[in-house]
């Protein structure tokens, strides 16, 4: 039952889920998905990235829609890749997507997989995550690698916008969305202060006290990482978290240099 400490068995690739154990839950948060930066994007890997998101969401939503006692709210992950490569255009929660990139198409399908619940009594929240910064790994770990060898610098021309958010704000914003019945639909989970790639690497270099004078040319990134470099490093997505702010969410880490200092243990502060 919903009060049990046991896990709920499911295997999305086979369309299997223990539906009975989902009865009576107050809320479900769905964050499953293959790491988009885990491997170079072969055709097979892109299929895994897409299917791990879309197929699992379709299975969960179909199951929830058939429950006798469904949850009050379902929070389903998405990503700001939904918007595509948009230059310096400011993108709020209601901005239209681009269908020109793999990540945008994937995110659109990912969100469309929740459509079955649109007219139900389940409150549906689609959290579009930005670049998540965590001391445990992920994007920040990869971004630190060149700095460890004093090779840090901008990627491409450095003018592309990176919309970032700390792991603490991810967790807190998820809790905020779960507890606030007025929030539904797409929610941008990003810091209110997006920055350019050049600004990001300069902030990181400042915190690490390392130089940022060795750029990574775009053509080199594309040669090494292919399409993945284009979409993850060189595309520009300037996103604002209007819905969170309008509903009163207060970011714990709104300023990049302060956030990096805390994450990298350089500030003497930490979050409880």
What residue spans do the PLM features occupy?
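Conserved Rossmann-fold NAD(P)-dependent oxidoreductase catalytic core, especially the SDR/UDP-sugar
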Residues: 58-101
